[in-house]
UniProtKB/Swiss-Prot annotation:
HAMAP family in the record: UPF0276
UniProt protein name: UPF0276 protein PA14_21580
Pfam families, per the entry: MbnB_TglH_ChrH
Signal peptide interval: none
Disulfide bonds: none
Biological source species: Pseudomonas aeruginosa (strain UCBPP-PA14)
Top-level lineage group: Bacteria
Family according to the record: Belongs to the UPF0276 family.
Length: 284
């Protein structure tokens, strides 16, 4: 039986956070997210600590290596392992990147896709296969990029087409929208507004690195910047409050600093909820 989805503000779980999160009775986030590839088969002390957290908090999985946009056959053994992991730990949902990461071997990076009708059809077919194997919906994420491949579609139209063709949900990564808007010169606000509200499952927030004035790199290694916070508020205004998760992969600060960012997410969610009530004639 599929469990209820998550709500509120979440945090990406990294191994360095196991001890701090498990040290006290109070965990100030509403859910956690992990890459299943990093935890499948982990036992011993780390495995016990991980299990303790999955028994205390709702969890999501965010995959790294399914290669949804690639041409190589889907890794069915990996898919079956992910399915077992999801069932073992009561994971609420599974998401993957709209990218390619393998071609006659693992590329160890998330490569951009051509925004073409052919890519839409290929990716949608692979998404449907994944959903059939996992026996649950798949959530796909818009990715950051630093080069464009030839294609007749704009990124926003490509993402929308995949969602409709595959009949799947979206993990809207707000920082990735900002990074790509800066790198390729499109309107981040219009992109977010154009996403279909009924398809948006949850959101990601993260920091990035600036390589000069014209290039931004999605690193997950810095605090969220003010323009990305503003885009999150815009996303809530367009689509309503959604569960939102903070990613931080390296340069990890004390847990209190990460909590400050997840608290800020909650505050924006609260304001969004109040604005929605006012629009319906409640409150002042």
């Amino acid at each position: 039986m599929q469990r209820e989805f998550v709500s509120g503000a979440g945090l990406g779980l990294r191994r360095a956070l196991l001890e701090p999160l498990g040290a006290g009775d109070e965990v100030r986030v509403d859910f956690l997210e992990v890459a299943p590839e990093n935890w499948i088969g982990i036992g011993g002390r780390l495995g016990r600590q991980f299990r303790e957290l999955t028994e205390r908090l709702p969890f999501l999985c965010h995959g790294l290596s399914l290669n949804l946009g690639g041409y190589a056959p889907l890794d069915m053994s990996l898919l079956r392992a992910i399915k077992g992991f999801i069932e073992q730990h009561g994971i609420r949902a599974y998401s993957e990147h709209l990218s390619a990461c393998a071609d006659d071997g693992q590329l160890y990076d998330l490569m951009p896709l051509p925004f073409s009708d052919e890519s839409v059809r290929r990716v949608a077919e692979r998404v449907r296969v994944v959903q059939d194997v996992l026996e649950r919906p798949l959530i796909v994420e818009n990715v950051s990029a630093y080069a464009r491949l030839p294609g007749e579609l704009e990124e926003v139209d490509f993402v929308r087409a995949v969602l409709e063709e595959a009949d799947c949900q979206l993990l809207l990564d707000v920082n990735n929208v900002y990074v790509n808007a800066c790198n390729f010169g499109f309107d981040a606000h219009a992109y977010i507004a154009a996403m279909p509200s009924r398809r948006i499952a949850y959101l990601h927030m993260a920091g990035h690195d600036e390589q000069g004035a014209s290039l931004k790199i999605d690193t997950h290694g810095a605090p969220v910047c003010d323009p990305v916070w503003e885009l999150l508020a815009h996303a809530y205004a367009c689509h309503g409050e959604r569960p939102t998760l903070l990613e931080r992969d390296f340069n990890l600060p004390p847990l209190s600093e990460l909590y400050a960012e997840t608290d800020r997410i909650r505050e924006l969610q609260r304001r969004s909820g109040e604005a929605q009530l006012r629009s319906l004639g409640y409150g002042t």
